[in-house]
């Protein structure tokens, strides 16, 4: 993640894949449940817009939930769960993704990397604990970056199209990400 992907984001805005001018809209489902329509734009402004309703609801009722639809990549979920933890809230964040992981012993990707993050508040606006991880051994972006840089990847990061571990990022991107923990 990070600035490395900024040129791609710009290309996706220029091509129309992302609406760079989208204005997210928050819909209140119940007093503690909200749905944000990102309108084809970036997830970050949609998440921030949703937090304007989510945080007061969580503080008032002790729990609240929010979903975001029609958005581009949320990138690092820990950034968002960290914001909530700094405000004294226990935060859980999840996202879906396209199939990128073959199950243990398999060849064909059928499971998404489905990133997840958990953040626990500390004292005085601090974060006590934060985890941000993918269901793959490493993020897809790490393999993609190695491919772009012409570097090998460590064994265990990805599988080739035959389901065999590979150190070749090109073969890994053609095959599958390795599942977290090997299973």
Residues of each region from the PLM?
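A generic, well-ordered mixed alpha/beta core segment in the N-terminal half of proteins
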Residues: 33-123
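Active-site cofactor/substrate anionic-group-binding motifs, chiefly glycine-
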Residues: 2-55
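Internal helical hairpin/lid segments
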Residues: 175-183
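Generic, ordered loop/turn and secondary-structure boundary motif
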Residues: 4-7, 19, 37, 105, ...
């Amino acid at each position: 993640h990070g600035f490395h992907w900024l040129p791609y984001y710009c290309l996706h805005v220029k091509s129309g894949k992302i609406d760079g001018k989208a204005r997210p809209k928050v819909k209140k489902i119940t007093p503690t449940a909200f749905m944000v329509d990102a309108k084809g734009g970036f997830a970050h402004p949609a998440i921030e817009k949703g937090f304007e309703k989510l945080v007061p609801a969580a503080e008032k009722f002790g729990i609240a939930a929010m979903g975001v639809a029609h958005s581009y990549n949320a990138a690092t979920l820990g950034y968002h769960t960290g914001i909530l933890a700094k405000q004294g809230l226990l935060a859980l964040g999840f996202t879906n993704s396209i199939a990128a992981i073959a199950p243990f012993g398999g060849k064909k990707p059928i499971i998404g990397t489905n990133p997840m993050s958990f953040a626990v508040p500390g004292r005085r606006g601090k974060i006590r604990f934060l985890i941000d991880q993918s269901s793959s051994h490493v993020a897809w972006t790490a393999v993609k970056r190695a491919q772009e840089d012409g570097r090998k990847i460590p064994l265990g990061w990805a599988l080739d199209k035959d389901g065999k571990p590979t150190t070749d990022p090109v073969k890994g991107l053609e095959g599958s990400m390795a599942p977290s923990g090997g299973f």
